[in-house]
């Protein structure tokens, strides 16, 4: 019997195969001090990324006026959601002890999703390297000089390619086109039409596939290999994407301090992150662990039809197993999470850092979307709601984790952050269709 056949008999895998919601605790999590010694990336790598984003801030502020107030910083609000907390408590008959906040990457400037972090960072890094090599820039310069015909004409000699289910493609497409690059976005069958239309309106070459995300990435990679002037943003194994996301943790630390929210041994922090291929939630988890070590507890949320990271970590097969191999179709309305196989880089980095993962049914994404809109006036896209039930599931199904980590008696002092990953770019009529659908599901 091969390894895959053995795993198909595992009780949790049987539930995954039946598209039942599951809650999984990672048995491989290690203390941060022990885990960090085995990791291939370190705090200096994240600080280097943060400094690069700071250098680009004058350019970003100049070409994206929506970032002016933040002086070219691509950042999102951290907000309390007390009415949503009350709504969840009443619906699930479960008190949520401690603070409940929403990190509104749904409202990040430029591309309206978490992918504005890693995607834009990686393109900026590539642009910086080219400009430095060809004498268009020094690191002492004001980077707003890149907003010139000379620089755009220079970047037009180069191209960028990416495979995406949607939001990463938006981020890469928008920033690459703004700099002057030729850019191709290879999009999978589940990518939303409005995302393709928006990219085409910005002169981005959109190539569509009948198949899923993995094929789109593979085709993008193949295109880049055939053209020495083409740079491929590899969502499955890019360190630069990962580090761009990790910077978010350093920004979040400042926001928590501004709101006088303490994170220490007596005040645990729980963060719930939607997960597709893993780059964004993995990078943020890595950054948070660097800062808060064992006082932060990160959980990934995935659709019941696409639990690729959970499956890879549970089996220890990482990117060597896909959800299709256990009979799942990888079809979900949470388009950004429709990934059948996890990132090789991220799944291995998460093995000692991640507290656990859970899955959520598509219908619940829509009911939560409507509930959040009604309670707080905040509209997120379906995939961005994947983590919303994390605090409920943690208490109902993760009590063992709380006891094992001496957290049960500290929960009154806990802070729960739901990472809202996208939504502000969704066309109004599309968002209202989501909202109405949330009202029809019983």
Swiss-Prot record:
Q: Per the entry, which co-factors are needed?
A: pyridoxal 5'-phosphate
PROSITE patterns (UniProt xref): DEHYDRATASE_SER_THR
Task: Indicate whether Mitochondrion appears among the record's keywords.
Answer: no
Under the heading InterPro entries, the entry gives: D_Ser_am_lyase (IPR011780), Ser/Thr_Dehydratase (IPR050147), Ser/Thr_deHydtase_PyrdxlP-BS (IPR000634), TrpB-like_PALP (IPR001926), TrpB-like_PALP_sf (IPR036052)
Question: What EC number(s) does its UniProt record assign?
Answer: 4.3.1.18
Q: Name one GO molecular function term.
A: D-serine ammonia-lyase activity
Q: Which residues carry this modification: N6-(pyridoxal phosphate)lysine?
A: 115
The chemistry this enzyme catalyses reads: D-serine = pyruvate + NH4(+)
Q: Name one GO biological process term.
A: D-serine catabolic process
Entry keywords, A to Z: Lyase, Pyridoxal phosphate
Tree of life domain: Bacteria
Family from the record: Belongs to the serine/threonine dehydratase family. DsdA subfamily.
The name under which this protein is listed is Probable D-serine dehydratase
Q: Which organism is it from?
A: Halalkalibacterium halodurans (strain ATCC BAA-125 / DSM 18197 / FERM 7344 / JCM 9153 / C-125) (Bacillus halodurans)
Q: Which gene encodes it?
A: dsdA
């Amino acid at each position: 019997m091969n390894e895959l056949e053995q795993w198909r008999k595992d009780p949790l895998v049987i539930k995954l195969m039946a598209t039942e919601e599951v809650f999984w605790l990672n048995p491989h999590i290690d203390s941060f001090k022990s885990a960090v010694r085995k990791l291939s990336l370190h705090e200096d790598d994240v600080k280097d990324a943060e400094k690069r984003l700071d250098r680009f801030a004058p350019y970003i502020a100049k070409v994206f006026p929506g970032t002016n107030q933040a002086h070219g910083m691509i950042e999102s609000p951290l907000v309390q959601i007390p009415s949503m907390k009350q709504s969840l408590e009443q619906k699930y008959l479960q008190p949520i002890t401690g603070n409940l906040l929403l990190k509104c990457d749904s409202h990040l400037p430029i591309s309206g999703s978490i992918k504005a972090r890693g995607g834009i960072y990686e393109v900026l890094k590539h642009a910086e390297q080219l400009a430095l090599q060809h004498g268009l820039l020094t690191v002492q310069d004001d980077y707003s000089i890149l907003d010139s015909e000379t620089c755009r004409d220079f970047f037009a000699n180069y191209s960028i390619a990416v495979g995406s289910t949607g939001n990463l493609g938006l981020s890469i497409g928008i920033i690459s086109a703004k700099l002057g690059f030729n850019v191709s976005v290879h999009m999978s069958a589940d990518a939303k039409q409005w995302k393709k239309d928006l990219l085409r309106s910005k002169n981005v070459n959109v190539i569509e596939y009948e198949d899923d995300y993995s094929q789109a990435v593979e085709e993008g990679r193949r295109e880049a290999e055939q053209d020495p002037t083409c740079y491929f943003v590899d969502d499955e194994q890019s360190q630069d994407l990962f580090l761009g996301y990790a910077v978010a943790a350093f920004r979040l630390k400042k926001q928590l301090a501004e709101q006088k929210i303490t994170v220490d041994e007596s005040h645990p922090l729980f963060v719930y992150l939607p997960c597709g291929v893993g780059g964004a939630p993995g990078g943020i988890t890595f950054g948070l662990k660097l800062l808060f070590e064992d006082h932060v507890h990160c959980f990934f949320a995935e659709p019941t039809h696409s639990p690729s990271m959970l499956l890879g970590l549970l089996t220890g097969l990482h990117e060597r197993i896909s959800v299709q191999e256990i009979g799942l179709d990888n079809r979900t309305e949470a388009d950004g999470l429709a990934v059948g196989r996890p990132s090789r880089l991220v799944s291995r980095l998460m093995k000692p850092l991640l507290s656990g993962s859970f899955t959520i049914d598509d219908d619940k994404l829509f009911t939560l979307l409507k509930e959040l809109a009604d309670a707080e006036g905040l509209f997120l896209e379906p995939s961005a709601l994947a983590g919303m039930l994390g605090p409920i599931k943690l208490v109902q199904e993760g009590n063992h984790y709380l006891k094992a980590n001496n957290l049960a008696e500290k929960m009154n002092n806990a802070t729960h952050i739901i990472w809202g990953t996208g939504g502000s770019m969704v066309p109004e009529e599309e968002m209202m269709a989501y909202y109405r659908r949330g009202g029809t599901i019983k």
